[in-house]
Design a protein with these regions (language model features):
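Predominantly soluble domains enriched in secretory-pathway, periplasmic, or organellar proteins
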Residues: 1-189
Length: 189
């Protein structure tokens, strides 16, 4: 389920159903009036943001088990970069038809962020303790940044030249984290 909420008064405008199991990743293409949702069914769901109707639900790769977590868009070239917690790859998908353009071999992934200023994609690998820097044209891994413990979320500076990575501390049900989480700043120039 996706809830459409008014940003001014926080009232519910619409509820979009038929989005699959555990919709986890959301990415908005405001110009195209499309919202893309990834889910645990291994699907890419496309929603029309004017009508709040599901336009398509496409299973991206039937040959393996997938749990797509996050999605980042390159709206200029109609590409979605999608992370997978079940497979050691990031999918590159054409948002116009849901076809897979490439599978980038990297460890199981959590967060993904496209950087149009550098034409790069950044991906966190929580269990591996790494962040991949990927060329968005060739889909080659340019660099692997080792991080402490569990790299989690990603953000960019306004000029696209600095990457921020949140790092979660090791924690379990038996032993909670005792230190605060960290943020790593990576100069990309």
């Amino acid at each position: 389920v996706v809830w459409v909420v008014d940003g001014k008064d926080l009232t519910l405008r619409a509820t979009v159903t038929d989005t699959g199991k555990y919709g986890t990743g959301l990415a908005l293409d405001a110009a195209a009036k499309r919202l893309y949702v990834t889910n645990a069914d291994g699907e890419l769901v496309t929603i029309d943001t004017q009508s709040n109707k599901v336009l398509s639900r496409k299973k991206l790769d039937e040959s393996k088990e997938h749990f797509f977590l996050n999605i980042s868009l390159d709206t200029a070239t109609h590409r979605a970069f999608i992370t997978d917690s079940k497979q050691p790859q990031v999918l590159v998908v054409d948002t116009r038809n849901g076809n897979i353009l490439s599978k980038i071999d990297v460890p199981e992934s959590l967060a993904v962020l496209f950087n149009p200023a550098r034409n790069e994609v950044y991906v966190t690998h929580r269990q591996a303790g790494e962040v991949s820097v990927i060329d968005a044209k060739s889909y080659k891994v340019l660099n692997t940044i080792k991080t402490p413990t569990h790299p989690n979320s990603l953000a960019l500076s306004p000029d696209g030249q600095t990457l921020y990575v949140s790092v979660k501390q090791a924690s379990s049900r038996e032993k909670e984290a005792t230190a605060p989480d960290d943020v790593i700043r990576v100069a990309l120039k």
